[in-house]
């Protein structure tokens, strides 16, 4: 195996793994960053409807309650996210009663600096489709396309690459067409003693060429651009019979006189 072939195979495997990983993620929500989200406040405000749906706080009681409940929501909890490179980011997630908002605080400013985020950029959150406790975070620049179409495009491209990889040098349509056409021809002419041979390591016929084979008064015209095995003769009534397999339809013309001779021979 050549070095280039090895690297190409490894690259295809790596891209396939990435495509599978992306397909296993479920988009939760995204937010366009405000100046305060990337400013000196060092916090990201999570829209309330998304926060309560996807990141519910334990012992959360926003409508009043004991001092312990309020202290719990203010303290919050740690949320862990994986970025596009697989790196883990941990943020302090809590509810601020003063502003009645859900926020990511500790760890957020480091993420902003690492990704060089500015106001107008977008952050989006995802979750694993099967492991619901596994969360992901990503970002894109202002004006770039949404993440959902990107996932769709990757999935379609992966499908095309997979088809091209398994098909190799064989055209899938021709492979199926030949396999479905072959049994009918074999059954039709098997009683004449025709021999069917598997086509392995057989030179192809030049495209555009045709060949006519006469079989008991039947002219079989086989068009080119097909792979056909070498003829195998069989003997029926001291006559040599040749069989040619082809995935293309055959033009059959009957010679009445020859058929009558065959009938007389059988009688």
Swiss-Prot record:
DNA-binding region: 29-143
InterPro entries: B3_DNA-bd, DNA-bd_pseudobarrel_sf, LEC2-like
S-S pairs: none
GO cellular-component term (any): nucleus
Residue ranges of the TM segments: none
Subcellular location: Nucleus
Biological process terms in GO annotation: glucosinolate metabolic process; regulation of seed growth
Keyword Lipoprotein set for record: no
Name used for this protein in its record: B3 domain-containing protein At3g11580
Organism listed in the record: Arabidopsis thaliana (Mouse-ear cress)
